[in-house]
Amino acid sequence: MKELLLMALANGLVNNVVLSRFLGLCSFMGVSNKIESAMGMAMATTFVLTMSTCVGWLIEHLILQPLGLEYLRLLAFIMVIASLVQLTELFVAKQSPELHRTLGIFLPLITTNCAVLGIALLTVQEKLSFLETLIYGLSSALGYSLVIVLFAGMRERLEQTAQPALFKGAPLSFITAGILAMAFAGFAGLAG
């Protein structure tokens, strides 16, 4: 139990999928202008990342490995992710049309979010059990969610301040993301 808790802390805070592994930067930078849209993207990505990691593990261990079809792993995982994204998009469009409009193109782009595919592939590479895979996927997703919402809050606050013209927009966003990454590096002592 202690190992699973340490894995969750290490994954969510220390080895954060965005700030440490640099996965999922497209949606991280693109949707983090407002807290509301960042929270919507965080929820959608959390669902897709967690579910795709678990379903990917099942496909790997129940179909691909027994049949010697490991070379189809990438294709199978992409199909799982695309299916889950379609389900998520249908749900969001029906439940919250405003959020669906806010997320725009970024919702279907979860299909190509390298964080989702990367975490699913990492769990297979590290030969984790199903429970470890679930914890790994969920903690990575929650770490992504935490960072994108914090970053959106920081960007909203920065929009209300006077900024030098040279730093407006992307330059200040990248500097802010770098400072956030340094802050999360302070959690390194938690993982042992």
State each model region's role.
Residues M1-L5, L58-Y71, L121-L134, A188-G192:
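Helix-coil boundary and interhelical linker segments in multi-pass alpha-helical membrane proteins
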Residues E3-V18, L67-S83, L134-V147:
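Structural signature of hydrophobic alpha-helical transmembrane segments
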Residues M7, V14, T45, T50, ...:
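Hydrophobic core segments of alpha-helical transmembrane domains in multi-pass membrane transport
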Residues L23-S37, V85-L99, F151-A162:
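C-terminal ends of transmembrane helices
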Residues E36-F47, Y71-F77, L99-I110, L166-L172:
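Cytoplasmic-side transmembrane-helix entry/capping segments in multi-pass membrane proteins
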Residues H61-G104:
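Ordered, amphipathic secondary-structure segments that act as subunit-interaction surfaces
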Residues E156-F174:
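Interfacial loop-to-transmembrane junctions
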